[in-house]
Amino acid sequence: MNELTLIDFYLCFLAFLLFLVLIMLIIFWFSLEIQDLEEPCTKV
């Protein structure tokens, strides 16, 4: 019985970590896109 609760907690924790990683990747990609858009403007 305790094993099931531990497994559920572990799965929820993994899902939460994956969610955080996805958010960080999206923010990182978004910041890179913004830099790519700003760089040509400053160069020209």
Curated annotation (Swiss-Prot):
Source taxon at top rank: Viruses
Entry annotated with the keyword Ribonucleoprotein: no
UniProt-listed CDD domains: ORF7b_SARS-CoV-like
A cellular component annotation (GO) from this entry: host cell membrane
Organism: Severe acute respiratory syndrome coronavirus (SARS-CoV)
Primary residence: host cell
Localization annotation: Host membrane
Transmembrane segments: 9-29
Keywords, comma-separated and alphabetical: Host membrane, Membrane, Transmembrane, Transmembrane helix
Name the record gives this protein: Protein non-structural 7b
Record has Transmembrane helix as a keyword: yes
Lipid bilayer topology: Single-pass membrane protein
